Amino acid sequence: MALNTKTQLGNHQFTGPHTNADELPDRSGVYLITRLVDGLHEVIDVGESHNIAERIPSHDRMFQWNAVSGNAFHVWTLLTDEAQRMLIERAHRLAYNPVCGER
């Protein structure tokens, strides 16, 4: 399944939703954390990592994700290199203003 997003950088297609840490790619990329609201995925956090599979299970905001989502958050991933992932993360923070991870 795909989650399509739109930012000032253009359109992006994230894969997911991943609900199990074993499904996460051990690669560089951007991740969106979402919750379901009336059947639609609402972005609650955005991040980037050199290894998404390592980052998500040990993330310091996981307690926020669980609190905001009722312990039912979803992870969506977009694989990309370091330079692109930082730009894409910033663009998504601006476009979606997620409730978790104030920067």
What kind of feature is each model-predicted range?
Residues 101-102:
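Eukaryotic N-terminal accessory cofactor-binding modules
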Residues 54-76:
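A broadly used, surface-exposed interaction patch
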Residues 1-50, 55-58, 79-98:
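GIY-YIG nuclease catalytic motif and its immediate N-terminal context
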